[in-house]
Swiss-Prot record:
Chemical reaction(s) catalysed: a ubiquinone + NADH + 5 H(+)(in) = a ubiquinol + NAD(+) + 4 H(+)(out)
Organism: Galago senegalensis
Gene designation per UniProt: MT-ND4L
Enzyme Commission designation: 7.1.1.2
Listed PANTHER family: NADH-UBIQUINONE OXIDOREDUCTASE CHAIN 4L, NADH-UBIQUINONE OXIDOREDUCTASE SUBUNIT ND4L
InterPro entries on file: NADH_UbQ_OxRdtase_chain4L/K, NUOK/Mnh_C1-like
Protein name: NADH-ubiquinone oxidoreductase chain 4L
Subcellular location: Mitochondrion inner membrane
Gene Ontology terms describing biological process: ATP synthesis coupled electron transport
Membrane-spanning ranges: 1-21, 26-46, 61-81
GO MF annotation: an example: NADH dehydrogenase (ubiquinone) activity
């Protein structure tokens, strides 16, 4: 495995560990999720370029669309939670309440 792919997989693993370790704040979780999506985008782009598979060139763009949607929903949720509760602690949220 080339060193570039190893570094990208290491970045993905670091972001995944960040989600698992810093899960008390919503903002930290969102930043780690964005890091995971960025490393996945780079890995998919490099894999598509290395394979010379022309039909898969749209895959990184679709991944970016999903990342943008995830970021928009995450920021909307962060704004709603911080306006309602005044903090972004995930532990204090109960999503089962109406």
């Amino acid at each position: 495995m080339p060193s570039i792919s190893t570094n990208i997989i290491l970045a993905f693993t670091t972001a995944l560990l960040g989600v698992l370790i810093y899960r008390s704040h919503l903002m930290s979780s969102l930043l780690c999720l964005e890091g995971m999506m960025l490393s996945m985008f780079i890995l998919v782009s490099l894999t598509t370029l290395n394979l010379h598979f022309s039909l898969a060139t749209v895959t990184p763009i679709i991944l970016l669309v999903f990342a943008a949607c995830e970021a928009a929903v995450g920021l909307a949720l962060l704004v709603m939670v911080s306006n309602t509760y005044g903090m972004d602690y995930i532990q204090n949220l109960n999503l089962l309440q109406c």
